[in-house]
Amino acid sequence: MSLSQESGAHHDPQDYPVVSDEEDEIDILGEDDSCSLKSHFYLQPTHSEMGDSGILSPSKLSCTESESDSSGESEGGTSKDSPATPSGGKAKRALVKPPYSYIALITMAILQSPHKKLTLSGICDFISSKFPYYKDKFPAWQNSIRHNLSLNDCFIKIPREPGNPGKGNYWTLDPASEDMFDNGSFLRRRKRFKRHQQEFFKDGLVMYNPLPYYRPYSTIQPQQVLQQTPVACMAIPENLTMPTHLAPYPDIKRKVPYPDQGVHRGFEALDADNHPNKSQSKCSFSIENIMRKPKEPEPSFSTFNPHWNYNHLLQRPNSCLLPAVLNLSTGPLLSNAQGTRQYNLIKFPGCY
């Protein structure tokens, strides 16, 4: 009893907060270390750890239970929450994104179709049914499929037939893009496919078949223009020739624009030499004037010098003539005192 009184005399209540400071430092070390230190310093539970009913406080119980839990986990090998972890892992593994690009997915969808063509909705349905990852995230990647169809040359748009009801155009693969993937594996593309426009639009013209100006994606050379378009030549009397396959149209009332003033004056001088009296030889080349004056010498294209017969310049009523184009690629057809020139009159469509 004397020992207890002495201990009570030497220890006043102000010394107890020191224990709380030690507990704070132990919490920094960790929960397991705090329990081991308490068991080392306190052989018996103190009054503060005992409740009013004489039961250990929850902090003490937690230390004892932690030891039993750790031993139980080591023996059983599994924790209480172990069944929930594998199920969550399986769910995550099922939603892993497939290792295929959008081009590969579109190619898979088109190749599995019976007619080797599908609409945008058909492609999306195939991808959703084949890969659960895209099924759960359907609205987000549909625009990516649409952009890949439009921006890649390996996909060709096919318009829907008039008698085939439905919405949207069909999409198919370019025949030249069959070797786009290595050994038929969709994991990697060999190279990006680019369509050659000259082969795709081969022998096709957008506008005006006689002229190659509107041929898409091709370089037009001057020699090709002269070879593919009908050309009428107009030259000085010594070297002027007329194409024989062009038929004259004497009943056309159309004025021909002369490209060069010197050539125009040459025609006027020739008319003055062949017809001194212009008032008598002037004619409008109409059927009425021919019927009214049957006895007068009628100037026609046959009476002129055959080298100066230029009625072939008017070939069709709905055609017109461009100004003469200077071309030095072929032989000289125009010659005068100063030099040699050649004029080609190229027919231009769509003029009225």
UniProtKB/Swiss-Prot annotation:
InterPro entries (UniProt xref): Fork_head_dom, FOX_domain-containing, TF_fork_head_CS_1, TF_fork_head_CS_2, WH-like_DNA-bd_sf, WH_DNA-bd_sf
Q: Which GO terms describe its biological process?
A: negative regulation of DNA-templated transcription
Q: List the biased-composition ranges (Low complexity).
A: 73-82
| Segments for region (Disordered) | 1-32, 47-92
- What single Pfam family name could you report for this chain, choosing any that match? Forkhead
* Recorded GO MF terms: DNA-binding transcription factor activity; sequence-specific DNA binding
UniProt subcellular location: Nucleus
Q: In which tissues is it expressed?
A: Expression begins in the newly forming dorsal mesoderm and is maintained during gastrulation at the dorsal blastopore lip (Spemann organizer). At the early neurula stages, expressed in a row of cells along the dorsal midline that are destined to become the fllor plate of the neural tube. At late neurula, expressed within the anterior and posterior poles of the embryo. After neural closure, expression is detected only in the tailtip, the otic vesicle and at the midbrain/hindbrain boundary.
Q: Where is the composition biased (Acidic residues)?
A: 20-32
Give the record's keywords alphabetically. Answer: DNA-binding, Nucleus, Repressor, Transcription, Transcription regulation
Q: Indicate where this protein is primarily found.
A: nucleus
Its domain of life? Eukaryota
Task: Give the DNA-binding residues.
Answer: 97-191
- A cellular component term, taken from the record's GO annotations: nucleus
Physiological role: Transcriptional repressor.
Q: What is this protein called?
A: Forkhead box protein D5
Instruction: Give the species this sequence originates from.
Output: Xenopus tropicalis
